[in-house]
């Protein structure tokens, strides 16, 4: 082949063939819009089953930046910020999208892309120990990427420690899973989808960089946080009119050859 092989990113191709096949097979079907169709319902059900989280909220987004700033803005109070690695995507590679919603990225120094539960605890304690804490963005969430921006993986022990610290401090734990499929397939990985569902308030299973044309599936494991979340999706311009295109792609990716 005369096609150039490119290494600058992992999403230079279109999509896995089963995705294209299922989109073509269902192209002329008429369905309800905005993610309220049977295909999205099936995809939500399949994701809940894989996560062993029958009550989880599952919401489809077109892209990861869109998912990140919508989740952060919807879950935080106006005066709160999000603790993250200094190398974290929301801090350095999303053109200030989160901060454009009014929430400061509270960056912590990372080691190979990771932050620790102790760093979170120290940052939380330092905020409340400051006599001027009402003049400073209040930590309200912890954001991590897994795999990290450095290609490293959080272990189950590390994620468990982060989860416990967030629970103790009343912080939401949000995992950016744009490349989660890579991590799940790694021989070095000891986490599964059930672990993410048990340990995180919110995470997402990325499609855009993992075989879909586009699409991210946000899973919300806290029913209090899921309430009215669709209002936030719409307000942030993230509710796709032809929402079935997202559900279909996840069906194809998760079900196999023909998406059925």
For the regions a protein language model found, what residue spans apply to each?
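Conserved core of the PLP fold type I
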Residues: 55-76, 106-113
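PLP-dependent aminotransferase-class I/II
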Residues: 102-140, 144-147, 154-161
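General beta-strand structural signal in soluble alpha/beta enzymes
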Residues: 6-9, 58-62, 84-85, 144, ...
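Active-site C-terminal subdomain of aminotransferase-like
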Residues: 138-139, 153, 192-260
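Conserved PLP-anchoring active-site segment centered on the Schiff-base-forming lysine
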Residues: 74-92, 121
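Conserved N-terminal alpha-helix of the aminotransferase class I/II PLP-enzyme fold
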Residues: 16-64, 86-91, 97
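Catalytic PLP-binding core of fold-type I/II PLP enzymes
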Residues: 154-186
């Amino acid at each position: 082949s005369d096609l150039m092989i490119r290494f600058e990113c992992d999403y230079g191709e279109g999509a896995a063939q089963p995705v294209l096949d299922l989109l073509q097979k269902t192209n002329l079907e008429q369905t309800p819009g905005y993610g309220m169709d049977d295909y999205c319902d099936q995809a939500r059900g399949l994701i809940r089953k894989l996560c062993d989280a029958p009550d989880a909220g599952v919401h489809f987004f077109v892209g990861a930046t869109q998912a990140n700033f919508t989740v952060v803005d919807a879950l935080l109070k106006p005066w709160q910020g999000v603790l993250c690695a200094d190398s974290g995507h929301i801090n350095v590679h999303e053109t200030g999208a989160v901060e454009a919603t009014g929430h400061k990225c509270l960056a912590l120094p990372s080691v190979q892309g990771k932050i620790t539960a102790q760093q979170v605890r120290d940052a939380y304690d330092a905020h409340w120990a400051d006599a001027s804490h009402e003049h400073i963005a209040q930590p309200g969430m912890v954001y991590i990427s897994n795999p990290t921006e450095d290609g490293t993986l959080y272990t189950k022990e590390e994620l468990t420690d982060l989860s416990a610290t967030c629970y103790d401090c009343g912080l939401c734990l949000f995992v950016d899973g744009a490349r989660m499929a890579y991590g799940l397939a790694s021989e070095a990985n000891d986490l599964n989808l059930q672990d993410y569902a048990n340990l995180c308030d919110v995470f997402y299973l990325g499609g855009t960089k993992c075989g879909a044309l586009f699409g991210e599936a946000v899973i919300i494991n806290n029913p209090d946080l899921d309430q009215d979340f669709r209002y936030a999706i719409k307000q942030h311009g993230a509710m796709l009119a032809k929402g079935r295109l997202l559900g279909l792609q996840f069906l194809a990716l998760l079900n196999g050859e023909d998406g059925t």
